A protein has these predicted regions:
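Cytosolic regulatory regions of ion transport systems
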Residues: 1-467
Length: 467
C-alpha cells in the first residue's frame, strides 16, 4: 500500500474522523486504503473497536469536541478533520474546535434544511471549511438520473467543452458485439472509450476488446459528439413534467424544492400527517398527500400522468416496494434511495436502474476534497483541478494542468517511450481554446489541461500515471 505524502516529503497526511457510524466506517475504509494516517473518534467503544479491528488506524473513545482528546489525537499535525456524526450541531462544534486547535481543513456533514441559509456564517465564523449535505447532494444526483429512463452518468470538464458519460449497453444496442476500432464508424461520432465495467470487473480496454451486452462503458467526447452518441444508443433526454416523490424525508424535501423551482409539478406522499403539513407550508405549490406509499391502490392513482417516481423514505425496504409498484404501473423513470447493496442488486434485476445513496454521495464528496488538498502543493509536473467519481467510485476521472516537469511531455502517444501504468488512460487534451480527444498522434505540452481516467489507481499527480 502506498502512503500519500503532504507538504514535507516523508510526512504522511493525517486525517481525523469523528463519528464511527456507517458513513464513518465506509470513509475509514477509503482513507486507509489510500494510505493516509487515520485517527477515528466516537463515544461508542464498540464502534471504535470495529473500525480499528477492520482497518490500519488508531481509535479513541470520547467526545470529538473535547480539546484535550483532540490534542491527544495529534490535531496539531493533522491536515484534515471530518465530522460525520448523526448530529449536525455536534459536527459543526467539532469542526470549530478542531480549527481553533490548528487543523488545516475541516469538513462537516450537515443534513438539516435549516442550515441552507447559514452556510456562509458557518464557514466564515465557525471554522467549517467545507459543509457537505449528504441529503441535498443525493437529491441533486437523483434529479440528474431522472433526465433519462436509462442508466446514464454524465459529467462535464473544461466549462462544458468535454463530456464524460457512463452508460449500459443493451442487447439490441448498436454497440453490442462491436470491437473498439469500429466504434467511431458505427456511431459516426468521435468518442474514446476509457473504461468498461463487465460484471463488476473494471478495466481499461485495448483495441482488441469487444463491447458486450450488459457492459457499462465510460467514454469521453465533445458535446456534439456526446449527443450524437447517446441518440445512436437510443438514450434520449426527455423533459420532466410531473414527478411523484414518496417520503417527506430530507432527500424528499430537497428534491421537491429543486423540481418546483424548475417548473415541474410535484406530488409528495407521506404517511406522517405532521411531515405532510410541514411540506405544504414549505412548498404550497406541491400536491401533498397523507398516505402510505406501499399502498398499491394509492400509488396507481397518484402515478397516473406522472413522468417519474422517487422512493425517498428513510427505510430501504419501503423504497424497494415503492419502486417495484411504480415499475409495475408502467413508470419508466424511477429513482430510489437505497443504502443496502443487496437491495440495489434486486432492484436492478427488476428493471429499476436509478439507485442512489446518501452515504455514497457523502463519501465521494469527502474523498474528492481530501485528494484535492493532498495534490502536492510542491509538485511541478502537474496540479489537479477537478476530480469526478463514476460507477460508484470504481472509476475516476481527474483534470490536471500539465507542469514543466512532466516526464512524458512532447512524446507522441503512439511512441514506445510513452508508457502509462495499467488501468490508466489519457482521454482528452485541452490546449488554449481547443479540445482534442486523445489518439496515437496526440502529445502533451506544459500548460495543457488533460483528463485522466483511472480504473485501478488513485492518482494525485501526473507523476502517478507514468509507467
Amino acid at each position: 500500500m502506498s502512503r500519500f505524502l503532504h507538504g514535507d516529503k516523508g510526512k504522511v497526511m493525517r486525517v481525523i474522523i469523528v463519528g464511527a457510524s456507517k458513513v464513518g466506517f465506509a470513509l475509514a475504509r477509503h482513507i486507509t486504503r489510500e494510505g493516509y494516517d487515520l485517527v477515528v473518534i466516537d463515544r461508542d467503544p464498540e464502534k471504535v473497536d470495529a473500525i480499528t479491528d477492520a482497518f490500519d488506524c488508531n481509535g479513541y473513545v470520547g467526545n470529538g469536541c473535547c480539546s484535550e482528546l483532540l490534542r491527544k489525537c495529534g490535531i496539531d499535525s493533522a491536515s484534515v478533520f471530518v465530522a460525520v456524526t448523526k448530529d449536525d450541531e455536534t459536527n459543526i462544534l467539532c469542526c470549530s474546535a478542531a480549527k481553533k486547535l490548528g487543523v488545516k481543513r475541516t469538513i462537516a456533514a450537515v443534513r438539516g434544511p435549516e442550515y441552507e441559509k447559514e452556510m456562509s456564517f458557518l464557514t466564515d465564523k465557525l471554522g467549517v471549511d467545507l459543509l457537505i449535505n449528504p441529503d441535498r447532494a443525493a437529491a441533486e444526483v437523483g434529479i440528474k438520473m431522472l433526465r433519462y429512463a436509462e442508466t446514464v452518468e454524465r459529467e462535464m470538464f473544461g466549462n462544458g467543452a468535454v463530456h464524460l458519460s457512463a452508460v449500459e449497453i443493451c442487447g439490441n444496442g448498436v454497440l453490442a458485439g462491436v470491437k473498439l476500432p469500429s466504434v467511431q464508424k458505427v456511431l459516426e461520432a468521435k468518442i474514446l472509450i476509457c473504461a468498461i465495467d463487465r460484471g463488476g470487473r473494471v478495466f481499461t480496454p485495448s483495441g482488441q476488446d469487444e463491447i458486450k451486452t450488459g457492459d457499462k462503458i465510460v467514454f469521453a467526447a465533445e458535446e456534439a459528439d456526446m449527443e450524437k452518441t447517446l441518440n445512436k444508443l437510443r438514450i434520449t433526454e426527455r423533459r420532466l413534467k410531473k414527478a411523484v416523490i414518496v417520503g417527506a424525508s430530507n432527500v424528499g424535501y430537497y428534491m421537491t424544492g429543486i423540481l418546483l423551482r424548475r417548473g415541474i409539478k410535484v406530488t409528495v406522499i407521506d404517511n406522517d400527517e405532521g411531515r405532510c403539513r410541514q411540506m405544504l407550508e414549505c412548498f404550497p405549490k406541491a400536491d401533498v398527500v397523507n398516505g402510505d406509499g406501499t399502498d398499491s391502490e394509492l400509488m396507481e392513482k397518484e402515478l397516473k400522468g406522472a413522468d417519474a417516481c422517487v422512493a425517498a423514505t428513510s427505510r430501504d425496504e419501503e423504497n424497494l416496494v415503492i419502486s417495484m409498484f411504480a415499475r409495475s404501473f408502467g413508470t419508466d423513470r424511477i429513482a430510489a434511495v437505497i443504502d443496502n447493496i443487496d437491495y440495489e442488486t434486486m432492484l436492478k434485476k427488476s428493471g429499476v436502474n436509478h439507485i442512489f445513496s446518501t452515504q455514497d454521495v457523502a463519501l465521494i464528496d469527502i474523498i474528492k476534497d481530501v485528494r484535492l488538498l493532498d495534490n502536492g502543493t510542491d509538485e511541478t509536473d502537474s496540479s489537479m483541478k477537478w476530480l469526478y467519481a463514476l460507477n460508484s467510485g470504481s472509476i475516476e476521472a481527474a483534470e490536471f494542468e500539465v507542469g514543466t516537469d512532466f516526464k512524458l511531455q512532447g512524446i507522441l502517444f503512439r511512441d514506445d517511450s510513452f508508457k502509462l501504468k495499467p488501468g490508466i488512460l489519457i482521454a482528452v487534451i485541452m490546449r488554449g481554446g481547443s479540445v482534442e480527444i486523445a489518439g496515437g498522434n496526440s502529445k502533451i505540452l506544459p500548460g495543457d489541461h488533460v483528463i485522466v481516467v483511472s480504473a485501478e489507481h488513485r492518482i494525485l499527480s501526473l507523476a502517478d500515471i507514468v509507467g
